[in-house]
């Protein structure tokens, strides 16, 4: 009987100790959970605070929802921004933004993506999901590479990539952008006009000033709808005669190149209203050929007079 009682006593003690140890372990675990819970709560509060800040920057204009951030510190955009996926335009300037988030693909109704004057280094391939996007403005950034997926943005009408400095090529797939009307690639490192531009059927305005162009493609005339072509401050030495086949061209800027002559075929470009040949080492001296204003601008009247003088000079030399 005593043995049975002793055994029961040991069993009871063991149970008590096990219960006590379990409680100690639970208390220890609870103490460990509390800091984590506080961290989670802090994260939730921070996300709500950030989302509230972003919501304050959303406004309605012309029937569209715009997100406008200007001169604030947003080097990265938070994931909670997807809660505002109904926004149709992003206007984010001078924030130090370094990256376009991959969740941009969730903004399926986005019409304008304007991230000018930031520090963006690349365009994510997810950009191709934005089939409603009409304007992509990334001037004054650090973009070096354009993904071919941009060619899937079938509604794109305006593309601005000026002053990214080291950008020197565009993917061929961009020729699929059949609604693209305006392209600004000025102040970059292009050595040639990207072939995809020659195959864009709607292109009307192209600025490639301040690049490293040494020549123009012979088939430049394929840009049949082009109205304005800006090629100032390049390294061009000649203009191909095929430019005369660009029947809709009304503005041609060639100032600050290395041109020694003006192609005679340009005399027949009846739609050409504005042309600038200023700061080129042209062969003929035209001191008295045009009035002071035209001499300053080296415009259309200067061009016509130059061609006529060149033709007359060639005839005199032949005789």
Question: What kind of region is each of these model predictions?
Answer:
Residues 1-196, 200-218, 227-228, 241, ...:
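The feature captures the LRR N-terminal capping module
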Residues 215, 226-251:
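A contiguous binding-surface segment within folded domains or other stable secondary-structure elements
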